[in-house]
Design a protein with these regions (language model features):
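C-terminal anion-handling pockets and recognition modules
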Residues: 194-198, 211
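Catalytic domains of cell-wall/extracellular-matrix polysaccharide-remodeling enzymes
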Residues: 84-187, 219
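Active-site regions of oxyanion-processing enzymes, predominantly non-cytosolic
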Residues: 198-205
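Non-cysteine beta-strand/loop elements that form the S-adenosyl-L-methionine
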Residues: 74-78, 146-148
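Structural alpha-beta junctions
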Residues: 38, 138-146, 223-231
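C-terminal active-site rim and adjoining tail of enzyme catalytic domains
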Residues: 167, 205-221, 228
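Active-site beta->alpha N-cap acidic-glycine motif
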Residues: 1-74, 81-86, 90, 102-122, ...
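Histidine/acidic residue-rich metal-binding segments in metalloenzymes
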Residues: 60-66, 183-192
Length: 231
């Protein structure tokens, strides 16, 4: 698929998005941090693990609304029970995705068409599952895209296959700041050679709890500063 004439909202040739998984309590600090720099992201939620009351790991639906949705971020499907579609029988995979989408839409009153594959995603297949089958039932369930877990693409192009969307980089990628510099330094004008006019997307992914485990929230701060230009 060729995107030479595609532009992001406002006619912009470049955009930044963040995709973070599991709906854990660290998402509150993560959301507050990225919002401070004017960045937005997608929080991929397991509907079966939404907390009914405050606990140490998961957010409640009320907290998701307050700290994610009401601050201009969005939520997406991450499976009801965090099971890899590639390891489930198709009927189980369908149920896991559908139940998650229905529950999230009921809780938050919005249409949800995005997804990030949970666990090993489509990296490994068992129980008669295969990628073509997974892709087709996601389409039938109204899912418009699915972020993959097959590694980083180390680039900024939009996907050729929206159901195997490989992001630019995990936040712990050793080249993360070199990628940010390359992205920031790219200039696209009317004089840019026609084959180089495709839009660029910086697509960062991970889990917010990783910053707590590594005690490196300052790493997120530096990423946000460089991507936003706000210090």
């Amino acid at each position: 698929m060729y995107y030479e004439f595609l532009r992001f909202p406002g006619g912009k040739p470049k955009a930044v998005t963040l995709s973070y998984d599991d709906g854990c309590r660290d998402d509150i600090k993560f959301s507050e941090t990225i919002n401070r720099y004017g960045l937005k992201g997608t929080f991929n939620i397991n509907s079966g693990f939404i907390a009914k009351a405050q606990n140490e790991r998961c957010l409640t639906a009320e907290e998701m609304k307050k700290y994610i949705i009401d601050t201009g971020n969005e939520i997406a499907v991450h499976g009801e029970l965090h099971r890899a579609p590639g390891k489930q029988r198709p009927i189980e995979g369908i149920k896991d995705v559908l139940n998650c989408r229905i529950k999230l839409e009921q809780l938050f009153g919005t249409i949800i068409r995005g997804m990030a594959y949970p666990d090993s995603g489509i990296h490994d297949f068992q129980n008669n599952a295969n990628y073509e089958c997974v892709r087709e039932y996601l389409k039938d369930l109204g899912i418009a895209y699915a972020r993959s877990l097959c590694g980083d693409n180390d680039g900024f192009k939009l996907p050729a296959d929206w159901y195997n969307w490989i992001p630019t980089a995990h936040h712990n990628n050793k080249n993360i700041f070199a990628y940010i510099d390359k992205f920031n330094n790219r200039v696209l004008t009317d004089d840019t050679y026609i084959s180089n006019r495709e839009p660029w997307l910086f697509y960062l992914w991970g889990h917010s709890f990783e910053f707590r485990h590594a005690d490196n929230w300052d790493h997120l701060e530096e990423i946000c500063q460089k991507l936003s230009g706000k210090y």
